[in-house]
Amino acid sequence: MHAMCLEAAHRPLVARELPVPEPEADEVLIAVSACAVCRTDLHIVDGELAEPKLPLVPGHEIVGHVVEVGREVENLVPGMRVGVPWLGSTCGACTYCRSGRENLCPSARFTGYHRDGGYAGYTVAKAAYSFEIHGDYSDAEAAPLLCAGLIGHRCLRQAGDARRLGIMGFGAAAHIVAQVARFEGREVHAFTRPGDATAQAFARRLGAVWAGDADTLPPQPLDAVIIFAPVGALVPQALRALAPGGIVVCGGIHMSDIPSFPYSILWGERRIVSVANLTRRDAEEFLALAPRVPVRTDITVLPLAEANLALDRLRAGELSGAAVLDCRASRDAG
């Protein structure tokens, strides 16, 4: 099979021909149709996340069809359309796993980081961490739901019942969260890179009541701000935009250092919280919710061979919505 592989950090991905992997007893073999490109992939390629498996097939927003199941698999059968997210496996026995917080499991293994992911024609995944995809989405349209959607969903739940919601960094996750927030009756206030009129117009099309530069304040104090951009300097700015009792939710897996800020902008029972990974419950809830909203993903589809171009465009902030790699032709070899 064709695959795009990371062989060293800070280097472009390399095209390789790899054997089709074989599923273990609790795994499924999936013919990959589409894999969305996530900022986490970029952090791995750019060496900002330590010690990935090398060589590595990146990608953790995978949609495809089950080809083969391991002998212990009971929840999936060949032919089912499934999605595979970032959380690849957990121990199931630690305090976190036993209390519904498997996203914090110290033994967790992640797709496209510790385990080979979806930048390939086929992949194997734990059946317990693979989810049937419903709704009228094409495979490419469904792919961003598997991380941009899931992490966005978890961030929105952390924001509680916030009515006035700010979103900083209006990309793949934000454009999904905005739709869900509007469905829930919230006001969306979108913050973009200064001067990014295209992103601000995109946010308004998705129902934002206000869209402006990240270094400006919204017309009214907000109940919550979700930060998707990996920029630590946005944290103090988000605090300044909050009403007393509000919360800043940091949704990225990596962020530059947060600069010092005066206690006065935190005072008033304002809070800062990070979101780490996701749980299977998050996946089940969101994948059931998305068709009801309905969430519509804005995608740019590229062939798998252009994975480096997709990463470059993401790094440069040139994408609205999400880039998705078409992996169907990559099954032909191997």
Description of each model-found segment:
Residues 90-168, 195:
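NAD(P)H dinucleotide-binding glycine-rich loop of Rossmann-like/cofactor-binding domains
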Residues 189, 197, 201-271, 330-333:
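Glycine-rich cofactor phosphate-binding loops and adjacent beta1-alpha1 units
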Residues 1-63, 125, 153, 328-334:
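Short N-terminal strand-loop motif that marks the start
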